[in-house]
A protein has these predicted regions:
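N-terminal secretory signal peptides that target proteins for export/translocation
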Residues: 1-9
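Subset of Sec-pathway N-terminal targeting signals
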Residues: 8, 12-13, 25
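Substrate-binding/active-site clefts of carbohydrate-active enzymes
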Residues: 66, 72-79, 86-274, 289-314, ...
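Sec-dependent signal peptide hydrophobic core
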Residues: 12-20
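Active-site-proximal helices and loops of the catalytic beta/alpha 8
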Residues: 41-63, 179, 197, 265-367, ...
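Loop/helix patches that line or flank the sugar-binding groove of alpha-linked glycan CAZymes
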Residues: 91-107, 111, 348, 357-375
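Sec-dependent signal peptide cleavage junction
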Residues: 23-46
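Short alpha-helical segments and helix-capping/turn motifs at coil-helix boundaries
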Residues: 17, 63-68, 118-122, 348-352
Length: 375
């Protein structure tokens, strides 16, 4: 099922490239104002003969096709700079939020002020790193605070309103301007998307809200659009993985036709509005594979999914349903080799299973991200 395949040597060199780039960033200042915080680098290396994704493969929608002149095509040669928007650069203090509520400078579980204007101002810096694309935090409006008040949705994964921009990042026009400015400098833009869950609004496994005034924005305030089984407690139980809540976050039911359509429409609208070039799908493991395939096709840009598992057989199964996947199996083994003196044969064992992927050139390799401690 594989027509092109990275050699062990090529993929190993790409890993060394990531190590060099990330090491440079770790040595750089981490102050938010300096524009270095909240970011890391991933890469996908090109192989001759590899298939490039084109918009016509995903959708024939006239509106999306009309935008192709302004959109670059995400491909295997891209080096991606990941930005946690809130932690990057604060160019507009007026959108930081309420002091001592969601905005608490220096307290890392709360908003710190980074915004889309901040990324736009630092595009020359990013371009000079030698990267070709940026992957930014989810754009949708997040819940200000978790139910217990112990953290904010600074990261973008506590979705409140799928169809509105998070005011802490800026306006929709600010995001449009960011994508346009990035394109003018030859940089592609990847939006993180969260179709699996909203913030935590329901009482455990109940279909009742914890408060009548604390619920997601319409139309996602319909309890019938959700599973109500409580939290995942057994990650080896696939039924739980697909239908239970991830860390308390309310699990959307993609098998509900109305919910499914609303999710697809929300993100297609973001892509159409901004002209972004691709999407990274959060918690892809926790959604039906047929939904992931349909979602990518409908939105109309290539997607790569987060399957937070080190097993090649498990992760590679998703490669038939999305343009690409994050290479978590390599991530786990590379860290063991370079940080804990494990044998290089463990990395080779990962490379030897490349044939299991639909297109090994669409693996997004990395050793550092926003879900893990710095390498």
């Amino acid at each position: 099922m594989l027509t092109t395949k990275k050699t062990f040597q090529t993929k190993f060199l790409s890993t060394l490239l990531i190590l060099a780039l990330v090491s440079t960033m770790i040595l750089a200042p981490t102050a938010l104002a300096a524009g270095f915080g909240g970011s890391s680098i991933t890469t996908a290396v090109a192989d001759s003969g590899a298939r490039n994704f084109t918009p016509t493969e995903a959708a024939n929608d006239t509106e999306i096709q009309a935008m192709t002149d302004n959109r670059s095509v995400l491909n295997e040669s891209d080096i991606i700079y990941m930005i946690l928007t809130d932690r990057f650069y604060d160019a507009d203090p007026t959108n930081n939020g309420t002091l001592n509520q969601e905005y608490r400078p220096g307290q890392l579980k709360y908003t710190q002020g980074g915004d889309w204007k901040g990324i736009t101002q630092k595009l020359d810096y990013i371009k000079n790193l030698g990267v070709t694309a940026i992957w930014i935090s989810p754009p949708s409006q997040n819940e200000l605070l978790s139910r217990d008040g112990e953290e904010s949705g600074y990261h973008g994964y506590f979705t409140h309103d799928y169809n509105s921009a998070d005011p802490h990042f800026g306006t929709k026009q600010d995001l449009i301007d960011l994508v346009s400015a990035a394109h003018s400098k030859g940089l592609k833009v990847i939006l993180d998307v969260v179709p699996n869950h909203t913030a935590d609004y329901f009482n455990g496994a109940s279909s009742t809200y914890s408060s009548a005034s604390y619920q997601p924005a319409a139309p996602f305030n319909n309890p019938d659009w959700y599973h109500h089984y409580g939290d995942i407690t057994d990650w080896n139980n696939e039924y739980q993985v697909l239908n239970y809540d991830l860390g308390g976050l309310d699990d959307l039911n993609q098998d509900n036709a109305d919910a499914r359509q609303a999710i697809k429409d929300a993100y297609k609208n973001w892509i159409t509005l901004t002209g972004a070039d691709g999407i990274r799908v959060d918690a892809a493991r926790s959604m039906p594979k047929n939904f992931l395939q349909e979602f990518e096709s409908y939105v109309g840009v290539p997607s790569f999914g987060e399957i937070f598992v080190g097993d090649v057989d498990y992760v590679s199964a998703f490669s038939n349903y999305e343009w690409g996947v994050l290479d978590f199996p390599l991530f786990f083994q590379a860290r063991e080799v370079f940080a804990h003196d494990a044998s290089f044969t463990t990395v080779k064992a990962i490379f030897d299973q490349d044939y299991k992927y639909a297109n090994v050139n669409h693996l997004i390799t990395f050793i550092d991200n926003h879900d893990r401690d710095r390498f």
